[in-house]
Every structure is written in C-alpha cells, then in structure tokens.
Amino acid sequence: SKLEAERLLRGLARERGLRHLVCRFGTIFGTSPGMRFHTAVNKFCWQAVFGQPLTVWRTALHQRRPYLDLADALSAIFFFIRRGRFDGRIYNIVSRNLTVADIIAMIGTHITAPAIDYVDNEIMNQLSYEVSSRRVQVLGWQATGSLENSIAATIALLRRAGGRP
C-alpha cells in the first residue's frame, strides 16, 4: 500500500540516509496519451460524451474530495527536483477540493443535462474530506490547472474519438 511505501522510505532514510520526500496526490484528471477512465472526472466525461448515464453513488454526490490536474502533478514533481528538496516530509499536492456535484455541473456546461444513474450500494470510502497543499505552497509551488479547461479538453478529445457532438 501507499502507507507501507512511505514507511519503507522512512526506514531507508533512517538506516541508509536515503533523501526523499512523499507527494500525496489528489485524484488525477486530465488528458494524456495513456488516459485512465476509472476516476470521477475522466470517467464522467467519457460516459457523458458516449451517451451513457453518469454512474454516481448517491451518498457521494456531495462529498468533498481532493482533485489534481495532471499538469499540476508534473509541475510539483519538477518543483521538488529542481530545488533538490528531499527533506523526508509529506506534501499534499492538490489543484482543488470539489464535490461530485461540482464536477457534474462543470460537465453540464459542455453536454446538456447528462443522465445520471444513482447507485445505492455502499462505497468503499464514505468519507468527505478536503486536503490542503499549504505546506508546498509556502515553498513557492502553486496549482495552475483548471478543472473547467481540463473537462473541455477531455470532452473535445473524446468527441474526436467518436463521441457524440
């Protein structure tokens, strides 16, 4: 697991002097050559463009979660590498904290009234939470990614791949 990997890094730092840091990324969204469609933003865009109802856990509609633009993830990695800042600390890397309802509303500005299929099954993570990137922001890194722009780019890409206009 991710936490086990963090413990391993701390142990290697103690035992062998490994210089490291940990980036805890929000849920990634955005276009890339190897896009994945199992997380909320990309999955909902895919479903909406191809005329499928968005599958939403009813209990998750208003839960807040941390999201991260792919470009922001890369810029954070480069930020740390360029500064050689391997201080063993944990850094949350987040573009924005949003609800599923927020994401659906943004998709709705590009695709009129996407259908929603509410799922009443229990989800693995029932928690609603926000994550702060303050620790890395005070060092000078800022998220610049835009969920709105990323949704527009994802929808445009999927439409070119054969989705509905």
Residues of each region from the PLM?
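Active-site helix of classical SDR
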Residues: 1
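Active-site His/Glu-centered metal-binding helix of metallohydrolases
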Residues: 4
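NAD(P)-dependent short-chain dehydrogenase/reductase
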Residues: 7-65, 70-75, 107-108
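C-terminal substrate-binding subdomain of Rossmann-fold SDR/epimerase-dehydratase oxidoreductases
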Residues: 52, 57-165
